[in-house]
Amino acid sequence: MPQLNPTPWFPIMMLSWLIFSLIIQPKLLLFTPTNPPSNKTTTTTRSNPWTWPWT
C-alpha cells in the first residue's frame, strides 16, 4: 500500500509548494480586475413611510 509509505511525502509536499510559489502565484498576482473599485459619492435616499389604507 503506497499511501502508508511516508518516504515520498516530504519531497512531494516540497515540490507542490515549489510549483505553487513559482508558477501559480505570479500568475495570480498579475491578474488585474476588469472593474477596479472607484470612489463613489454616497447619496442618501429619502424613504417615505408606508400608508396603510386599511387602518
From Swiss-Prot:
The gene is MT-ATP8. Belongs to the ATPase protein 8 family. GO terms for biological process: proton motive force-driven ATP synthesis. InterPro entries: ATP8_metazoa, ATPase_protein_8. PANTHER family: ATP SYNTHASE PROTEIN 8. GO terms for molecular function: proton transmembrane transporter activity. Pfam families: ATP-synt_8. It comes from the Eukaryota. Residues 37-55 have a biased composition (Low complexity). Keywords: ATP synthesis, CF(0), Hydrogen ion transport, Ion transport, Membrane, Mitochondrion, Transmembrane, Transmembrane helix, Transport. Residues 35-55 are annotated as: Disordered. Subunit 8, of the mitochondrial membrane ATP synthase complex (F(1)F(0) ATP synthase or Complex V) that produces ATP from ADP in the presence of a proton gradient across the membrane which is generated by electron transport complexes of the respiratory chain. ATP synthase complex consist of a soluble F(1) head domain - the catalytic core - and a membrane F(1) domain - the membrane proton channel. These two domains are linked by a central stalk rotating inside the F(1) region and a stationary peripheral stalk. Component of the ATP synthase complex composed at least of ATP5F1A/subunit alpha, ATP5F1B/subunit beta, ATP5MC1/subunit c (homooctomer), MT-ATP6/subunit a, MT-ATP8/subunit 8, ATP5ME/subunit e, ATP5MF/subunit f, ATP5MG/subunit g, ATP5MK/subunit k, ATP5MJ/subunit j, ATP5F1C/subunit gamma, ATP5F1D/subunit delta, ATP5F1E/subunit epsilon, ATP5PF/subunit F6, ATP5PB/subunit b, ATP5PD/subunit d, ATP5PO/subunit OSCP. This is ATP synthase F(0) complex subunit 8. GO terms for cellular component: mitochondrial membrane; proton-transporting ATP synthase complex. It is found in: Mitochondrion membrane. Its main location: mitochondrion. It is a single-pass membrane protein. The chain crosses the membrane at residues 10-30.
